[in-house]
Amino acid sequence: MRLEQLQAFLKVAELGSFQQAALQSEVTQSTISRQIQGLESALKCQLFHRGAQAKLTVAGELFLRRARKICQEWDVASEEISSLFQGKQTELCVAAIHSVCVSSLPSLLPKFCLGHPQIQLRVTALGSDRALKVLQDGLVDVAIIMSHRNLTNTKELAIKPLYEEQICILMASDHPLTTKKFITWENLGPYPQVIFKDGYRMRRLVEDEFSRREIPLNVSLELNIPEAFYGVVQGSEMIALMPQSLVTPVIDNPNFSVRYLFCPESGDRQDFRRQVSVVTTVDRLQIPPVAEFFNLVVDHYRCGALTVK
């Protein structure tokens, strides 16, 4: 059963004539006849009484309502898809890691909203694993996440690295470690740590680094809100390994100390950093507002939205 067969059926039913249906459809009468015959063959019944006027049979009357509904649904679907690729969608959903929501999106989002007043932006702060999952499940249009070695461009995903940033040690200003001129991985071992919950790639990055160095990771608390890290660290001997963008809000606060890890082998700062990328699906890049938002994010960071020290 094909759409043109249904359309031919509806036209004949409306006009009561194969000839008139052919004229209005700008095809030959034999074409209309073949389409109706094909439909009758598929349904295994006669749909019209052939005579001076084409009248619907009982089966034809029954089928008429269904055929109208099918064609109406097709028209609606065609219009919706056409509107989608013309950029007429009414909302755009973004999932982003907390640090991006705090540091960069507040200045970036108004630019998009100004150019697309008809689109409502919905932004959700999630861990990288969850953000990627909701993107792949079709619940959001764009995800801004922490990269990992298995995150590569595929036939389904379009990925653009945005920036890299150092991982810092956040601790209270009177923490015992602040007396050290240099802080190494081994120095961190004895102290309780606050880390991100499962589903956050920062947690995995920290766990992997401690494991690689065969240093026990003393986890005392799991959190997922940056502000909670500040409160816990400020009032205890707990420390937190956090990306630079998340320690920036408290870097000048006298209650905190922000330090970088030291590498004895090089005699310099330990190169412990993470990469952040923007991700969407390849098919979504064909939708104008999604492509524009994706490129806006890329350009935003290309212009130095984050200064990495």
Swiss-Prot record:
HTH lysR-type domain segment(s): 1-57
Record Pfam families: HTH_1, LysR_substrate
Biological process according to GO: regulation of DNA-templated transcription
Gene3D superfamilies: 3.40.190.290, Winged helix-like DNA-binding domain superfamily/Winged helix DNA-binding domain
Keyword Ion transport: no
SUPFAM superfamilies the UniProt entry points to: Periplasmic binding protein-like II, Winged helix' DNA-binding domain
GO terms for MF: DNA-binding transcription factor activity; sequence-specific DNA binding
UniProt keyword list: Activator, DNA-binding, Transcription, Transcription regulation
GO cellular component, one term: cytosol
DNA-binding residue intervals: 18-38
InterPro entries: HTH-type_LysR_regulators, LysR_subst-bd, Tscrpt_reg_HTH_LysR, WH-like_DNA-bd_sf, WH_DNA-bd_sf
Biological role: Seems to regulate utilization of fixed nitrogen by controlling the expression of a certain gene(s) involved in nitrogen metabolism.
Family: Belongs to the LysR transcriptional regulatory family.
Protein name per Swiss-Prot or TrEMBL: Probable nitrogen assimilation transcriptional activator
Organism from which the protein derives: Synechocystis sp. (strain ATCC 27184 / PCC 6803 / Kazusa)
